Amino acid sequence: MPALAPPVGDERHALHTFLAYQQDAFVAVAHGLTDEQARATPTVSALSIGGLIKHVTGMQRIWMQRVAAAPDKPPTDTRDIEERTREYRDEYVMGPHQTLAGLLDAYAAQNAETLRLAQTADLDAAVPVPRDSPWFPKDVEA
């Protein structure tokens, strides 16, 4: 992985290259780790490398649903709150029966979908920001 992203010719190519560069960083961080090492939390943080990979996979999926629906909102998740809460909590933890290879396969599939949308999405369409999350500024319109 190079230290700097390569030069680009236009906005869409820049977006694609930037996203691919960021995606590659997580693969590099996990390179050579065993499942046990990917699951480990050796610092005060409860996050592991495997948990981070699951989280970035999920965040790409959620944001790409928004990008695909823009300028409209994505379809509402109609599952019950307990199921959505379990999924949210599970997103940060590499479970005992999960493998790093499996997580990286899911990540690679989502990366491909993200890069596909970067090539096809309307870059002028405003992507709605969730209003139900406290970490998003209330004064952001898109």
PLM region spans:
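Alpha-helical bundle segments that constitute or directly flank the non-heme di-iron/ferroxidase center
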Residues: 9-35, 54-55, 59-69
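Individual transmembrane alpha-helices with interfacial aromatic-anchor signatures
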Residues: 135-142
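Short, aromatic/basic-enriched loop-to-helix "N-cap" motif that marks the start
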Residues: 42-47, 140
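Short, helix-capping/interhelical loops that line the mouth of catalytic, cofactor-
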Residues: 1-13, 58-117, 124-135
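Short, flexible helix-adjacent loops and helix caps
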Residues: 31-38, 119, 123-126
